[in-house]
Amino acid sequence: MYSFDLDGMHIDSTARTPYNVYNTLSAYTALKTMGAGYAGFKDMIEAFDYGNNRESIFTIDGARVQLHLAKNPIGFQQKISLVLKDEKPKDIIIQINDTAQDGRDISWLWDVDFQYLADSNASRIITAGTRRYDMGLRLKYEDIPCETTTDLKSVVADCAKNGTKNLYVIVNYSGLYRTNHMLAELEKGGADK
C-alpha cells in the first residue's frame, strides 16, 4: 500500500505497486488539465479495490505470496524495482508463456535489466511456463542461477512451506488468471492440498 501527497492532499492508496500510483497521478493530471472537478478524488482513490488485476496478495501456509503481471519490458522493470525494494529474503518464480495472447515473440526479454535480480536477496529463482528455458537462458546470461519447473503448483507449495515465507510470482498475460486461481485454492486449503 502506498501513501503520498498530491496537490495538498495526503492519500493513503490501496495501490500495491508504483504502477498503480502512476495511474492515479495520470488520472489526477488529466482531470486538472481538462479543468474538470475532482471533488471526492481522494475518497475514490482510497476506497478503490484493485481486485484481480496486475497484482494480488495471498497467504499460503503463513507465507506472503505476491502475484504480479509483467507483459513487456517496462512492466517487468517495475516488478524488478518492487522486488528490490523488499530487502527481506525471498523466493521468486517467473512464468513466461508464448500463447497467442502473450505474443509468440519473446525477444523482449532481452530488453529487461534482469541483472538487478542478482541483488534481490533471492534464495531461489525458478522459471516456469512454456518459455521457462528461454527465461532460464536469459538469467544465465546475467550469471543468475535458477531452477526450472513444469509443476508450478508444487513449486509454489514447496516455497510456501519450506522457503523464505516471502514469495514473488511474476507471470505474463496468459498465466495471470490460472495462477491467480491456483494461488486462491492454495490459500484456502494450504500447500498440502
Language-model features, listed with the residues they occupy:
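Adenine nucleotide phosphate-binding catalytic loops in nucleotide-utilizing enzymes
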Residues: 1-73
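Residue-level signal for inorganic ion chemistry
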Residues: 23, 27, 125, 169
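Glycine-rich phosphate-binding loop signature in dinucleotide/nucleotide-binding domains
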Residues: 34-37, 85-89, 161-166
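Active-site beta-alpha connecting loops in nucleotide-dependent enzymes
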Residues: 51, 69-148, 189-192
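Generic beta-sheet signal
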Residues: 64, 90-94, 165-171
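Short, polar loop motifs at secondary-structure junctions
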Residues: 130-133, 152, 173-174
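A short, well-structured beta->alpha microelement
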Residues: 147-159
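Glycine/aspartate-rich loop-and-adjacent alpha/beta segment that forms the canonical ThDP
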Residues: 169-193
